[in-house]
Regions:
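Mature-chain termini and adjacent capping regions
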Residues: 1-171
Length: 171
């Protein structure tokens, strides 16, 4: 496994393998089993791993990821786990887009959907497309969920104000 560690200033680099993408006529760098860790000044940590990362030379700050697992460790809070089939990670600002079969779990809660935009610097996540929240006693079906991972403050709503969030009791 290869590791990247980023503490907003320092980067430990790993060996990379370059391949030519002949169909796009551009050069990309591919990294297997990538692990990237970022820590902010408050002591919060964001770790993202993927089976495969592609970095295109023309925009090297973006990594296109496959089989993604991420953890958000907020100081003195529960750990949040995020998994998805694909992701796009920005190594400059740590913003990440998770897509296809996105699952977010933390103790007693699970959110699933097809698209999640996550900002580590602001600890905000926005879920869209087929969003389902499952709690210990309630399931919610909505178009959009916005969540602050530090405070766990959550907004759940529909895009069309004429529609309502569907709420089901589970017990």
């Amino acid at each position: 496994m290869k590791y990247f560690t980023k503490n907003f200033e320092d980067i430990k680099e790993t060996q990379i393998i370059e391949k030519i993408d002949e169909s796009q006529n551009s050069t990309s760098t591919y990294i297997n089993d990538i692990n990237y860790v970022s820590t902010d000044i408050r002591g919060n940590k964001y770790q993202i791993t993927a089976k495969l990362a592609e970095i295109k030379i023309e925009n090297s700050e973006l990594m296109y990821l496959s089989d993604v697992v991420a953890f958000v460790f907020i100081k003195n809070k529960d750990t949040v786990k995020i998994t998805s089939n694909f992701g796009k990670y920005n190594s400059k600002n740590y913003d990440t887009i998770f897509s296809e079969n996105v699952i977010v779990t933390y103790p007693g809660h699970k959110i699933t959907g097809e698209y999640l935009f996550f900002s580590f610097l602001s600890n905000l996540g926005t879920f869209t497309t087929n969003v389902v929240y499952a709690g210990e006693k309630t399931n919610l079906f909505a178009d959009k969920i916005e969540m602050n991972l530090a405070t766990k403050d959550t907004k759940i709503f529909m895009n069309d104000t004429g529609k309502k969030v569907l709420i089901e009791g589970t017990k």
